[in-house]
A protein has these predicted regions:
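Active-site and adjacent substrate-binding regions of carbohydrate-active enzymes
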Residues: 1-186
Length: 186
């Protein structure tokens, strides 16, 4: 048995093991020494889990592990770091991206990306897009992290439908949709 929250081919790392953490830090530092300018940490909110109590996201060791990683790696160089955190809320997101630099530069949160998902359906089977809710969520996050943290603005990634197809009309108004979305993000 081993814990895997995604594919059986993707076992979760045991972040409680100090030798594992050091191996991760050594790998990060190897890349920093070669001039990499930043890192994206996939599902970073899952590293501090408490499996005994079935806490998989935002567990008790999450932020201590990120701070330790940052002090051993990221703080050595002028980098941009972003953590993908599906479980982040505006109230907790500033911990990831606090301007004091103790953790990460910014956070990816996904509240705006799941507004049209339908409970019990596949992630590609979307409901009509709730544009007013979308604007309110964007505003809420921007205001909540203003001068406290850095919320990364994005509209798609490798796990989600492409932005023009998701938020626009890729058949009739592909170019117009792309321009509108680019203007909004900028």
């Amino acid at each position: 048995y081993y814990l895997h929250q995604f594919s059986v081919k993707q076992p979760d790392l045991n972040w409680e093991n100090p030798k594992l953490r050091q191996a991760v830090y050594d790998m990060i530092n190897w890349w920093i020494d070669r001039g990499v300018g930043g890192f994206r940490l996939d599902v970073i909110d899952l590293i501090g889990k408490d499996t005994d109590n079935c806490v998989m996201a935002e567990g008790p060791m999450l932020h201590p592990f990120i701070r330790e990683m940052s002090s051993h790696t990221f703080q050595r160089a002028d980098l941009v770091t972003v953590g993908e955190a599906w479980s982040a809320t505006p109230e907790r997101a500033f911990l990831y991206s606090n301007p004091d630099g103790s953790e990460l530069s910014m956070v990816f949160q996904f509240e705006h990306m799941v507004l049209d998902q339908q409970p019990g359906k596949e992630k590609w089977d979307l409901a009509p897009f709730p544009f007013v809710k979308f604007k309110k969520v964007f505003t809420k996050w921007q205001q909540a992290l203003y001068q406290k943290g850095w919320n990364s603005l994005f509209l798609d990634n490798h796990d989600l439908p492409r932005a023009v197809s998701h938020f626009g009309n890729d058949e009739k108004y592909r170019v117009e949709s792309a321009k509108m979305l680019a203007t909004m993000i900028h």
